[in-house]
Each structure stands twice: as C-alpha cells, then as structure tokens.
Design a protein with these regions (language model features):
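Short amphipathic alpha-helices and their capping/turn segments at secondary-structure boundaries
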Residues: 109-126, 166-182, 263-269, 296-314
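C-terminal interaction module
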Residues: 35-43, 240, 247, 299
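Alpha/beta catalytic barrel-like cores
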Residues: 1-151, 274, 308, 318, ...
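Short, well-ordered coil/turn segments that N-cap beta-strands
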Residues: 31-35, 125-130, 180-184, 222-227, ...
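Glycine-rich beta-strand-to-loop/alpha-helix junction loops that act as flexible
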Residues: 135, 189-191, 323-326
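Alpha-helical structural signal in soluble globular domains
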Residues: 30, 119, 176, 215, ...
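Active-site loop segments of alpha/beta catalytic cores
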Residues: 132, 151-264, 278, 282, ...
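Catalytic-face loop-and-helix region of soluble metabolic enzyme cores
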Residues: 246-353
Length: 354
C-alpha cells in the first residue's frame, strides 16, 4: 500500500440530523471521503450495535426496553449450521462466491446506506473516496450480553459467529458501494478498546483481541478495501498495528500525544504504508471555541510530537487523514454542523500549507 492521503477529510459515522437528505448533503459537501450517516434519530435499530445485528443467530431486540441481547439457551446448532454454511459459501478463500448478502443491512436498520446509494446512483460518477463503517467485533461482543447478562465475548461459540458476521457486513458494504467509488475505506469501530487493560476487562487477552480484529481486517482486504479502526479514547495503539489495520484513527484533540508513546509501532505502521487519521476536530462543546487556526495549531503540535520520536514529518504529512475525534450523533445539530465545516477547513488549510 503506497497511498498518499495528505490530509484527506473524512468522519466517523454517527450524525444527529433528523433529515437523511441533509445528512447526505453534509457528507458529500464537507468531506473528501464521504460517509454514509448513522442516524439514531430513526430509533433503536440505528443504535451502534443493533444496526449490525441483522442475520446473526439468536439476536433478540426488545423494543419496549430499548435494548438487544442474545438467547444462548437450548440447542442452537441448526441455526449456527445455517450461518456457517452461508459464511463458507461467501468467504472460503478457494471456492467462496464473495456474496455476503446473508449479512446485509436493510433499509429498516440504515436509512443512511440506502439514501447515499440512491444519491450516488443519480449522480452517475465515481467518487475518488468513500467510507463505510461497522461496529468492531470486540466492542460488539463485550457490549452485548446473553440472558444472564454475561458479555458474549466470553462465549467462544457466539464470539466466533460475531467476528465472522462483522467480517461479512464489512464486505457487503464495500461490495454495495464499489460501483460508486475508486477507493473504499471501511472503519471497524472499537470504542471499547479505550478500556482495554482495565480491571473490567482483565480477562480479555491481547492475542484474542488482535486475532479478532485481524480477521475482520483481512475480510476488508478481500474486496480491495482499506481497513481502519477508530477508538475515541486512549488505548494500546500497538494492538491496531499488530492486527494489520491500514488506518489508525484516534482523538488527536484530547489524546494526540498518546500515539508517540508507541513510536516503534507507529514507525512500523507508517513504514508499511499505513495511514494515521488524526481526529483533531473535537466532538464536545469545546468545538464552540475552536477555529481553523487553533485546530491546525493543535494538529501541528501533535504531529511534531510524533516526529520527535524519529519518524519523518514528511511521512506523517503524506499519510495523514483528518477526522472529528468521534461521531457527532449525540451533539447539538449546530455544533455538529461546525464539526463538519472544521473538517473541511482544516483539511483545506493543511493541504495548502504542505
């Protein structure tokens, strides 16, 4: 991989808007690499994990309580057999068809996917870049629980199904948008990695996390996609590098110095052509006080901090992407509008400077 993104502007999936057409307008007008918007306004089915639950055996959505869990009781061997048959038919490296429609996301679960597809089809020309996204298998399996409120991660049978389901959902999205973009980025969002190593998840092994993430990354590569991982807090960034992600996305406004603590991993990542997505645009009320100039200064500071470890500043520049620090789904709409405007302005200003 030798792609030079040089401050390409993109974003995390969630948006606070109630008008899907407006969300698409913002995405296409403010971002070099547009996204399909995840719109929680439309209800439970566009919530971060539930949005990716269709087709997974034993998922139970409780509309009244506003949550989802998995039923692991009784005999589920037939349901798993159907799942694995669909998985192998699609994903077998020698004879797989690549057809991942068994894990499709319907319009009921994503207004944004279908609204963006319709707009791009009407536009009739390919975009240079497009970004899709999936909740990562670690966050999915550690957040969702069984009937005993035990996280699914600790059930190895269900964990494997979830990893493979997320892999297929990534491929399905890439395949869906391939006719409309030259390059597709697929983010595997792993917010829970900010708690990795804490007492809550002390029994979660690093090797298992790396292996789970790598399995999804490899699926993204099957369809020629670039695999990124977003984590909005601090984490052990070397995990993402060891998992083989192409893009490491982090909060460069609050935690921008933390990547330099993993200088050897960052050097390895950039050396193999990997990209760093600097989430320098805050998705907190702090956005109200920020200007393009203040955010460019913050970006320069954290890039220089990484360069001080011995990594070429020119390499950092050429392999940089600009994003918000997290999704904007929980923000006031006016604040979210400013976030996307700042992505555009900072991206433009940094390209002009370098």
């Amino acid at each position: 991989m030798a792609i030079k993104t040089k401050f390409l502007g993109s974003a995390i999936g969630s948006m606070p808007f109630s008008d899907v057409g407006h969300a698409i307008d913002v995405s296409l007008s403010k971002l070099d690499c547009p996204i399909w918007p995840q719109l929680s306004f439309f209800g439970l089915k566009e919530q971060m994990e539930i949005q990716y639950s269709e087709g997974i055996p034993r998922a139970v959505i409780d509309e009244v309580k506003g949550r989802m869990s998995f039923d692991t009781t009784g005999d589920y061997s037939d349901e798993f057999a159907v799942f694995y048959d669909a998985y192998m038919t699609a994903m077998d490296p020698d004879s797989g068809t690549g057809d991942c429609s068994a894990m499709a996301i319907s319009e009921e679960f994503s207004h944004g996917i279908y609204a963006l597809e319709k707009r791009l089809k009407a536009n009739g020309k390919k975009l240079p870049w497009l970004k899709v996204q999936t909740t990562g298998p670690i966050s999915f399996a550690l957040t969702l629980v069984d009937e005993n409120k035990r996280a699914l991660w600790y059930n190895e049978e269900f964990r494997d199904v979830i990893i493979k389901s997320m892999a297929m959902k990534c491929r399905w999205q890439i395949q869906k948008f391939k006719p409309y973009a030259e390059n597709i980025i697929c983010f595997i969002d792993e917010p829970i990695l900010s708690a990795f190593g804490s007492s809550t998840y002390v029994s979660v092994s690093r090797d298992e996390v790396v292996a789970a993430l790598n399995e999804v990354v490899e699926a993204v590569h099957m369809d020629g996609g670039l695999a990124g991982t977003h984590c909005c807090g601090n984490t052990e960034w070397s995990i993402l590098v060891d998992a083989g992600v192409d893009i490491v996305n982090f909060d460069a406004f609050e935690f921008g110095e933390t990547v330099a603590m993993y200088a050897d991993s960052m050097k390895e990542h950039l050396g193999r052509g990997g990209l760093l997505a600097w989430g320098v645009i805050p998705t907190s009320p702090a956005i109200r006080e920020q200007t393009c100039e203040s955010l460019c200064a913050q970006l320069e500071k954290v890039m220089d901090n990484l360069a001080a470890t011995g990594i070429s500043k020119q390499t950092i520049i050429e392999q940089a992407i600009i994003t918000p620090s997290c999704g904007t789904g929980s923000m006031a709409q006016d604040d979210a509008e400013k976030v996307f405007e700042m992505v555009k302005q900072v991206s433009t200003a940094m390209k002009k400077k370098y």
